[in-house]
Amino acid sequence: MKVAVYPGSFDPITNGHLDIISRASKVFDKVIVGVLINPEKKGMFSVDERVDLIKRVIKPFNNVSVQSFSGLLVNFMENNDSNVMIRGLRSVGDFEYELQTSLMNKKLNPNVETVFMMTSLEFSFLSSTAIKQVAVFGGCIKELVPDEIIDDVLRKAKEFN
């Protein structure tokens, strides 16, 4: 069974993230969405809230699950019998960053492979940071995040502001 891990902060999960999850679920036997616990980074949503939001939007995918993790990604992958990491790319800038991260992970565990998936064109401008800014300032996020979580993002944006 080929298990892939799709790591990130997902604060919040976007339609771009969901697009990568959907496409990866067709390539791999199992996809684990790994939500990074980063105590140095204050997110809009707590880690538990992010896991809950993701659980709600991945229901249609039988082979996708979500877990939070802290520490090294390669250790999380090893604990989940995975040697494949999925990363979405929107731009050349993403590639530069992801290449360095991929090489470091390869150095830490030579068995880890990174699969880069190009973001679909309609989502190439999306980022969780941009969505938070739009939501905080009262803009429309309807086509930016999954419908199931729009109300959660808008409610949290009011609190965050």
UniProtKB/Swiss-Prot annotation:
GO terms for biological process: coenzyme A biosynthetic process. It is found in: Cytoplasm. Its main location: cytoplasm. Keywords: ATP-binding, Coenzyme A biosynthesis, Cytoplasm, Magnesium, Nucleotide-binding, Nucleotidyltransferase, Transferase. The keyword rRNA processing does not apply. InterPro entries: Cyt_trans-like, PPAT, Rossmann-like_a/b/a_fold. It catalyses: (R)-4'-phosphopantetheine + ATP + H(+) = 3'-dephospho-CoA + diphosphate. ATP binds at S9, F10, H17, G88, L89, R90, E98, F123, S124, F125, L126, S127, S128, T129. Pathway: Cofactor biosynthesis; coenzyme A biosynthesis; CoA from (R)-pantothenate: step 4/5. One of its GO terms (cellular component) is cytoplasm. Pfam families: CTP_transf_like. Substrate binds at S9, K41, L73, R87. Belongs to the bacterial CoaD family. Homohexamer. Reversibly transfers an adenylyl group from ATP to 4'-phosphopantetheine, yielding dephospho-CoA (dPCoA) and pyrophosphate. PANTHER family: PHOSPHOPANTETHEINE ADENYLYLTRANSFERASE. This is Phosphopantetheine adenylyltransferase.
